[in-house]
Structure formats: C-alpha cells, structure tokens
Amino acid sequence: MARPLKTIALEPIKQPERFTKEDFLSQEDITQALDLALKQVRLNMDYFKEDFPTPATKDNQYAIMDNTEWTNAFWTGCLWLAYEYSGDDAIKALAQANDLSFLDRVTRDIELDHHDLGFLYTPSCMAEWKLLKTPESREAALKAADKLVQRYQDKGGFIQAWGELGKKEDYRLIIDCLLNIQLLFFASQETGDNRYRDMAINHFYASANHVIRDDASAYHTFYFDPETGDPVKGVTRQGYSDDSAWARGQAWGIYGIPLTYRFLKEPELIQLFKGMTHYFLNRLPKDQVSYWDLIFGDGSEQSRDSSATAIAVCGIHEMLKTLPDHDPDKKTYEAAMHSMLRALIKDYANKDLKPGAPLLLHGVYSWHSGKGVDEGNIWGDYYYLEALLRFYKDWNPYW
C-alpha cells in the first residue's frame, strides 16, 4: 500500500542541449577507461595487500589501515567490479580474503555502532553472495543487517545515523542511509522476515518526507523529537550550510530512490527522483562535474566533488531501466549521464598510475574539517568503476 509522500518541486531541465554537444560514449571509450582503472586496481592490490585504504588520499596517495572505517568495503567493491570485468582469479581471491575480514568484523562487533552497515557489507559480502553464493558472505551480510536494525527508532520510524541511541542530540537520520537500507531489503528477501523490509520502507518515507526539501534539494541530516517522533529540523554536517545542498547528499538521493523503487514500485518515487535529479543537473558547471556543494558554480574557486557526479551517474542509469521510452525526460537523462561520465573519464580519472593512487581525482571528503579536499576518495573510486561497468555490460547491482 502506498504511503503518503509529499510533492516536491520539479524544475525544468535548463539547456538540455548542453548534454548533447558530444557523441555518447562508445564501447571503446568505456573499455579504455576500464583498462586504465584495472591497472590502478592491480597496483593497489600489491600496495594494500589484505589491508585497506584510508577514506581519502593525501597528495593523491592513500595510506594503509585496518578494517575499522565506514569506507573500507568500497575498496573491496572495487575488487569485485575489477573481477567481473577481468575474470582474474587473483583479484577474486583478494576480494574473498577481504570479505572474511568483514565476517570477522561483524562477528566481533568492531566499530559498527553507526548506520553505515550497508556501505560496509553491500559492496563486499553482498557482492560476493550475488556473484559466488559463498555461505560465509551471506552470513556476514545477514549479521550486518541484524546489527543495523538495532539502530531503528520506532518514534519517527527511521534508522538513527550516529551517536547514542535515543539521545536528543543524536536523534537524526541522514540522506546517505538511502543506500544503507538496501541491506535490509536483501535480508528480508533472504530470510523471508518482513521486519527488515518494513524498517527499510519506514526509513525511506521518513527520509523522503523530511530530509528532502520542498524545492527538491536535500538536507544532509534531519532531527526528530525522541519523545514524540515529530520532525524537528534539517541541518548539515558535510554541506556548506544548513540551507545549501551538499552535492554528495543530493547524489545519494538520486541513487537511493531508484534502488528502493525496485521493491516499492510506487510511481510517486519516480517524481521524487526527477525532482532531485533536475535540481542536480541544473546546478552542474560547464564541465558537468559538480562542485562539492550545489550552492557553488563556475567561477566560485571551490573544489569539485567528482564522487558526487559518479554516484549520480549510477543513480540515473538505474532509473533508466524503469522509465518507459515515452517519458519526456528519458533522452535528456541518458545524454546527461553520458556527458557526466565522459567528463570524469577525460578530466578526472587518474592517469598517473602508481601504487596507492586513486582511480578518480578531485573529490571532497569533508570540507569543514579539511579532510580529503581536492583529493581522491575510495567511494569515488568505487562508484566511478561501477558506472563504467554499468555502461560496459548489463550489470547486476550489488545494492
């Protein structure tokens, strides 16, 4: 049964012809980009061995860390994507070794008191289960889902992002979690237990009705009253200001909505996707790669966030599977994702291959804290590689 979903603004796409100045990417374009990325992945395999990269680079060089960050599985996801493209058993073996580390992490409950269980267990263990059906990978993903539902708050109907459960100062969701709830849909499908699905759906509607603004932009986070569950206010933690639109947050919405649509099939979700996507496309600079916050445009001298553009490409590609050919925006969406990915390949993909280097340059991790500004980041690497594989073949999402 459909739930109430607020109506948001739908801006017309401005100057859609800007996305058709160049031809669509050819299979040769994609293959060349994948071959280059694969070379960097192989260099990084020797560099990281069975450890993991830090979330972002410093001077375009990852440091090496253990499996304790929220970002670690994006490297493992790069390995699974590279394995799908190459068929190289050495890549598969390292990815499986990584996944055993994730099984150990969830079994021992190491640094998992947050909402990012989907980011940790989808591109790693869920990917392995979908590709190889190894029982250990399924076990790890289901344990992670059980850990994630512990953060569900009945009052407000959402998964609390961070902090002490139920504490007023921490009683909020964040837009990123639209990707994390895909782990709960997976758990429901695998176990037949609708409890996971129900929590995911409740969280989705809490997000759609509150963290997404009426003008189709998004807050980063949204607070609820822990006593009543009533909505309180939207604030940022990563964006420029509480009133601006953090580019990566907007992209999480663009991707999270079509992923959730697969399970809900509610037409209102398409309109939600369109609103958020049009808002994003209308604020791209001339080279089609977003600044780190959509409040900035050409001439602002701010940093881009290439990872946000890579995520948006994946989201548009996912929704295009659903949109009928007669949809008035479908051709523009297709042209836009080709234009954005072409820009990433041409001007943002790392071509200076060396151990520990990123696949994708010019991202932003956290502007306010000065972390990873105009650097590579591992989720940018992952979503760039995912976008390439989506264009290369009929790819079955890990999400």
Curated annotation (Swiss-Prot):
Keywords: Glycosidase, Hydrolase. It is an enzyme of class 3 (hydrolase). GO terms for biological process: polysaccharide catabolic process. GO terms for molecular function: chondroitin hydrolase activity; unsaturated chondroitin disaccharide hydrolase activity. The active site is at D116 (nucleophile), D176 (proton donor). Its EC number is 3.2.1.180. It catalyses: beta-D-4-deoxy-Delta(4)-GlcpA-(1->3)-beta-D-GalpNAc6S + H2O = N-acetyl-beta-D-galactosamine 6-sulfate + 5-dehydro-4-deoxy-D-glucuronate. Belongs to the glycosyl hydrolase 88 family. PANTHER family: HYDROLASE, PUTATIVE (AFU_ORTHOLOGUE AFUA_7G05090)-RELATED (PTHR36845:SF1). This is Unsaturated chondroitin disaccharide hydrolase. It comes from Streptococcus pyogenes serotype M1.
